[in-house]
Amino acid sequence: MKRILLCLSVLICTFTNAQETVYKTIENLTYATSQDAYAQERCKLDIYYPENLKDCPTVIWFHGGGLTSGNKSIPTKLKKSGMIVIAVNYRLLPKVTISECLGDAAAAIAWTFKEVEKYGGNKKKIFVSGHSAGGYLTAMIGLDEKWLNEYSIDADSLAGLIPFGGQVIS
C-alpha cells in the first residue's frame, strides 16, 4: 500500500510541476512614435508574460512620480498572476508638456493593442492601471477619447481602468 501511495504521490507531483507556468520578462522595448532623442531614451516598456498561456488578460502599468520622476517596474503583486504585465516609462516634466506625457501613454497602449497577441494576450482583455501620476495617466486616457483616437483605438475597447491615487485636474 505504501508503494502505491508513493507512486501516486510522485505521479501527482510530476503532473503538478509539468503544469507550472513559466514567466519571461523582456526589457526596454521601444514604443515611441517620435524620433527625438528624449523619446527614444524614455519611451520604453518591459513586458512580463506567462510563456505557456494564451488568451491572457493584460495590465499596462504606469509608474508614479508626479510626472517629474520615476521609472517603470513590474509590481510584485501582479507577478505570477496568469496575466501579462507591461510596465511603461514615459517622458517627464519639465522636458515635455503634460500633453506629451499623455501622448506617450496613448502610444504605449497602442503598442500593446498591436503587439500583445504575440505574447499570449487578448486585445479584449487590456486593462490600464498606475499609481499616483500613473493613475492620472490612466484616468485621462480613459476619460478623453482623443488620446487613443489618434491611433484609431476606441477608449471603450479597454477592458478597464484601474487608477490608484491620481489627481484628475489638468
Question: Where are the regions that the model predicts?
Answer:
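N-terminal cap/lid segment of alpha/beta-hydrolase-fold proteins
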Residues: 19-53
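Short beta-strand element of the alpha/beta-hydrolase
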Residues: 55-64
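Short beta-to-alpha linker loops that shape the active-site pocket of alpha/beta-hydrolase fold enzymes
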Residues: 65, 89-96, 167
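Primarily recognizes the serine-hydrolase "nucleophile elbow" in alpha/beta-hydrolase
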Residues: 113-170
